[in-house]
């Protein structure tokens, strides 16, 4: 049996992670063990069978699904008044995850969510102090925003999402906890609203561009033209995976089957070659959920 330690997160980044986050990791008992050879064999067979089935595809037609899901979180929040009730249900689906290039099984409550938040916070807490305004696009329930606000309550946080339920979540939670610096706004990746002013601000996405497949041209153009100070993505990026590696190959097939984000890094590299942006970092974190390594980091800025 192993425990997630700060070095598991630190080893994937070049900067020193926040002492506050280190303390949080140390106080969180995230226990796991790698799958045995027999378990890994069963996992791979099951994965292949999943890929042979009909999987729900991401895209524009899924908005009603997200509206329903975020409304469910809101109803739970109204009963508990606990921001943790905003954590999406997909973080609670199973006890299989990925860490340090291994498939693992967890033995701790909300393992997937906590591990995910450690990797996200480790990077964002390095950059948030440099900006007055922080924008999350595709923020869902707003759970990242409220968690980050605990570290940086003097900053202004904004969460954009195409779901109206998302804005309701943020409004209700902000009222309940007495927060005046977290606000929601409606934003559709497929039809970006240029009235949303992100100039010189920190912009980030966490597994939300995932949902737009190849249709990222409009939102990428919006990001470039709106001149944010910095853009950080935690997204499924097939270009960094190795199709000669079995687990990477299966992940790529899963991306394709679900119509997840495609060719986004390729588009960024083209923009960089044209002198329009500068890519500062592309980094595999080697952690993920049961079926995918879905949070490769890309950091870039408009020129």
What role is predicted for each listed range?
Residues 201-215:
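A short SAM/SAH-binding and catalytic strip from SAM-dependent methyltransferases
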Residues 140:
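Conserved glycine-rich SAM-binding loop
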Residues 143-191:
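Class I SAM-dependent methyltransferase SAM/SAH-binding core
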Residues 112-130:
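Conserved alpha-helix/loop element of class I SAM-dependent methyltransferases that forms part
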Residues 1-118, 248, 270, 274, ...:
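N-terminal accessory regions of S-adenosyl-L-methionine
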Residues 136:
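Class I SAM-dependent methyltransferase core
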Residues 228-239:
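Conserved beta-strand signature within the Rossmann-like core of class I S-adenosyl-L-methionine
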Residues 246-272:
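Conserved Class I S-adenosyl-L-methionine
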């Amino acid at each position: 049996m192993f425990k997630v330690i700060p070095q598991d997160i630190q080893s994937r980044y070049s900067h020193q992670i926040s002492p506050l986050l280190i303390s949080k990791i140390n106080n969180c008992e995230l226990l796991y063990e790698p799958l045995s050879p027999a378990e890994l064999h069963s996992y791979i067979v099951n994965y292949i069978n999943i890929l042979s089935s009909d999987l729900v595809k991401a895209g524009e037609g899924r908005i009603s699904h997200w509206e329903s899901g975020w409304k469910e979180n809101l109803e739970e929040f109204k009963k508990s008044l606990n921001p943790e009730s905003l954590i999406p249900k997909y973080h609670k689906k199973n006890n299989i995850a990925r860490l340090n290039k291994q498939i693992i099984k967890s033995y701790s409550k909300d393992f997937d969510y906590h591990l995910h938040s450690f990797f996200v916070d480790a990077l964002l807490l390095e950059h948030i102090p440099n900006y007055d305004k922080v924008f999350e696009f595709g923020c869902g329930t707003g759970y990242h925003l409220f968690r980050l606000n605990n570290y940086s309550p003097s900053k202004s946080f904004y969460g954009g999402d195409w779901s109206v339920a998302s804005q309701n979540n943020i409004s209700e939670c902000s009222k309940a906890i007495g927060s005046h610096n977290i606000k929601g706004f409606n934003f559709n990746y497929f039809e970006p609203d240029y009235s949303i002013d992100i100039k010189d601000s920190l912009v980030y996405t966490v597994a939300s561009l995932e949902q737009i497949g190849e249709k990222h041209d409009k939102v990428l153009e919006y990001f470039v033209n709106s001149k944010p100070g910095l853009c950080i993505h935690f997204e499924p990026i097939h270009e960094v995976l190795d199709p000669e590696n079995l687990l990477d190959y299966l992940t790529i097939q899963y991306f394709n089957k679900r119509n997840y984000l495609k060719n986004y890094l390729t588009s960024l590299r083209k923009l960089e070659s044209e002198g329009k942006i500068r890519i500062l970092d592309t980094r595999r974190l080697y952690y993920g959920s049961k079926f995918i390594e879905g949070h490769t980091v890309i950091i870039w800025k408009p020129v």
